[in-house]
A protein has these predicted regions:
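Short amphipathic alpha-helix that is part of the acyltransferase structural core
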Residues: 1-24, 107-142
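Conserved donor-binding loop and adjoining core beta-sheet/short helix segment
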Residues: 19, 25-78, 167-183
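Active-site rim helix/loop that mediates acceptor-substrate recognition in acyltransferases
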Residues: 19-37, 135-157, 161
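Conserved GNAT acetyl-CoA-binding A-motif
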Residues: 82-90, 208-218
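Conserved active-site alpha-helix within GNAT-family acetyltransferase domains
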Residues: 91-99, 198, 218-236
Length: 240
């Protein structure tokens, strides 16, 4: 059975130590159950135990499940309800077409120091939007979502500046219970291969008490992130 939850505490009996749990729980912390564009579901077995949790932001879904989840029920649920995208691990083997990549994780804290550069923990979001590759995103909707998450301590934006100009930026798109998900790391082209990007990521990792996760494309950036202490943890799938 899959049910829409009405209160945050309905997820209290479920836990999984992975990136999808952080993503869902951070979204729930930020928006609670107060908005019709951010919805949350639980899948229950015959004994009433939660076997998976699901978040929906607009029409984009994330699924976190345990070993006893009902894959066929989830397949039927998404077929009936429709979706723009579904994000989960490779055990969420739905019949829809998908892209996939690698999940990485680290809890190693090694801060790198670069002379003449400073960290700004409260940058203007417009500056980040202009630097990052958000060609398919609408600034207003992106700004409303990210700023809302930041105000609720569920996300964080950081830049590395040289002479008061941004040379590199990164965002923790989800923060929950001292763990975080790193996304949208970017460096201005003329400042690449100079150590600024790795210095920023290292500083961001040190700012998180727990683990830091990321999702990368299967053939990109493995060496860069491994040098910063990240290890491959499995695969993500994005159904569309």
């Amino acid at each position: 059975m899959i049910k829409l939850i009405e209160k945050k505490k309905e997820f209290d009996d479920f836990f999984k130590d992975d990136i999808f749990y952080i993503r869902i729980m951070s979204l729930l912390k930020a928006y609670s159950t107060n908005y019709n564009f951010a919805l949350f579901y639980k899948q229950l077995d015959d004994n009433g135990n939660i076997t998976s949790i699901i978040s929906r932001l607009d029409n984009d879904y994330t699924v976190c499940h345990n070993d006893d989840f009902d894959l066929l029920e989830l397949e039927d649920f998404f077929t009936r309800i429709g979706f723009n995208s579904i994000l989960g691990d490779d055990e969420l083997a739905l019949s829809f077409s998908y892209d996939y990549g690698i999940i990485m994780r680290t809890n190693k804290k090694v801060e790198k120091i670069i002379n003449y550069a400073t960290i700004d923990e409260y940058p203007k979001l417009m500056d980040l939007f202009n630097l990052e590759d958000y060609s398919t995103a609408d600034f207003e909707s992106w700004y409303v979502d990210v700023s809302h998450r930041i105000r609720h301590s569920c996300a964080k934006a950081v830049t590395l500046n040289v002479n008061d100009e941004i040379v590199s930026s990164g965002i923790f798109s989800s923060i929950y219970n001292n763990d975080a998900i790193l996304t949208s790391v970017s460096t201005v082209p003329e400042f690449r291969r100079m150590g600024y990007g790795s210095a920023l990521v290292s500083a961001m990792i040190c700012d998180i008490k727990g683990k830091v996760y990321l999702m990368r494309d299967k053939n990109k950036n493995e060496k860069f992130y491994k040098k910063l202490g990240f290890e491959n943890m499995g695969y993500w799938r994005m159904y569309k």
